[in-house]
A protein has these predicted regions:
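Single conserved hydrophobic/aromatic residue that forms the stacking wall/gate
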Residues: 1-13
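Non-heme Fe(II) oxygenase catalytic core, chiefly the N-lobe of the double-stranded beta-helix
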Residues: 15-254, 259-288
Length: 288
């Protein structure tokens, strides 16, 4: 059932003490009292799924390491799994993307604001990441609420953006990106797609801005100069501090985020230290 603790909302299950607490005014909730390494019961999944739609990003604290097959199984509760167009897969578990940054890395995953693989025709709906190895300090992940970004535009500008579509490209992001992890991408064609600038969330019906600094390169209906000006304005707007929260990881924390209404940015401020974990990505549908 539900209970209120002060001004915070918690949800308690009769068989366990799952507790859901708002993480920041803009976005996110922290969840305690559920052991993801054992998977989710039907009742637990229902509570987690509701919280996912209500809060956009879920932070699961005090976790054990999730076995890869359980990680995959939890991801599949939300839908089919998405296969990354560029990154190396985990041996024996092709659905798992291993995140690993160390002293010799040329790049780090997600070190700019983005929504995961928005260049795909059907971009992923969500991502579930667990980190097992962390730097002593640094390596935080920031999240920004794209519902709020849309809602805080003037009504006139909302209407203008409602009629626009944008090109999302990935060649400049992925080409050669994973060469230090044994990926030879010679001859590979990386995806690009056109999506609405404002997308409607298929489960909540709410509108969210859907342009990001990593993948979005051009607004289709505008001239090049107009496109650059409008895109720069929107990207700066999306990155406002008041739409954001910042998560400091502890070992084995798990974060589940909704790519349809949230952008994120993984800070690479910990070189030469190491950061490592595993993620599954849940397939989504074509934005509208």
């Amino acid at each position: 059932g539900f209970c209120l603790v002060g001004s915070e909302m918690c949800i308690r299950d009769s068989n366990m003490s799952m507790e859901i607490t708002r993480f920041s005014p803009a976005v996110g909730a922290e969840i305690r009292g559920v052991d993801l390494s054992r998977g989710l019961t039907g009742e637990e999944f229902k509570e987690v799924h509701k919280a996912f739609l209500d809060h956009q990003v879920l932070f699961f604290r005090e976790q054990k390491e999730i076995p890869p097959e359980v990680h995959v199984e939890i991801g599949k509760r939300f839908g089919n799994l998405h296969f990354h167009p560029a990154a190396p897969q985990m041996e024996g578990h092709p659905e798992i993307f291993v995140i690993h940054t160390h002293r010799d890395s040329k790049i780090a995953n997600g070190e700019f604001w983005h929504s995961d693989v928005s260049c795909d025709e059907e971009p992923p709906l969500g991502t579930m990441l667990q980190l097992h190895l962390l730097p002593p300090v640094g390596g935080d992940t920031l999240f920004s609420n794209m519902y709020q970004a849309y809602e805080e535009l003037s009504e006139t500008f909302q209407k203008f953006c409602d009629g626009l579509s944008a090109l999302h490209e990935s060649e400049h992001v992925y080409r050669g990106r994973y060469s230090d992890r044994g990926v030879d991408d010679a001859g590979k064609v990386y995806p690009s797609s056109v999506h609405p600038v404002v997308r409607t969330h298929p489960e909540t019906g709410r509108k969210a801005l859907y342009v990001n600094r990593a993948f979005t390169t051009r607004i289709q209906e505008l001239s090049e100069d107009e496109s650059r000006a409008v895109l720069d304005l929107l990207l700066d707007h999306c990155e406002q501090l008041s739409f954001q929260t910042r998560f400091r990881w502890q070992k084995n924390d798990v974060v589940l985020w909704d790519n349809r209404c949230v952008q994120h940015h993984a800070l690479w401020d910990y070189w030469p230290e190491e950061r490592k974990g595993r993620r599954v990505t849940i397939a989504g549908d074509r934005p509208y």
